[in-house]
């Protein structure tokens, strides 16, 4: 009545791997990003608008921590300094098309 199936064929969820996860051939190990401000012992300043441009997109949005790699402390300070630079007209609020 029932077919005789060995245990390897029965458990198709593991896909032949013992840990139960499929191995992704496209997976790459990424180097953990380090905070530029911690590395250089520097504090974000609104007067250095050329340096602040690296943390702002073309549309004028502040890039998040997960992309820039800044620490939480410096990201908060960076956001304040970008806003100061915008208020002083050193950085644009939005890019004009």
From Swiss-Prot:
One of its GO terms (cellular component) is cytosolic small ribosomal subunit. InterPro entries: Ribosomal_bS18, Ribosomal_bS18_CS, Ribosomal_bS18_sf. Disulfide bonds: none annotated. Residues 1-25 are annotated as: Disordered. SUPFAM superfamilies: Ribosomal protein S18 (SSF46911). Residues 1-22 have a biased composition (Basic and acidic residues). Binds as a heterodimer with protein bS6 to the central domain of the 16S rRNA, where it helps stabilize the platform of the 30S subunit. This is Small ribosomal subunit protein bS18. It comes from Borrelia turicatae (strain 91E135).
């Amino acid at each position: 009545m029932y077919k005789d199936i060995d245990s390897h064929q029965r458990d198709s969820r593991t896909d032949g791997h013992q840990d139960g996860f499929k191995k992704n051939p496209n997976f790459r190990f990424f180097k953990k990003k380090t905070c530029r401000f911690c590395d250089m012992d520097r504090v974000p300043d609104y007067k250095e608008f050329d340096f602040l441009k690296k943390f702002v997109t073309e549309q004028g949005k502040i890039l998040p921590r997960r992309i820039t790699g800044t620490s939480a402390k410096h990201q908060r300070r960076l956001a304040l300094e970008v806003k100061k630079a915008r208020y002083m007209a050193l950085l644009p609020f939005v890019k004009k098309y």
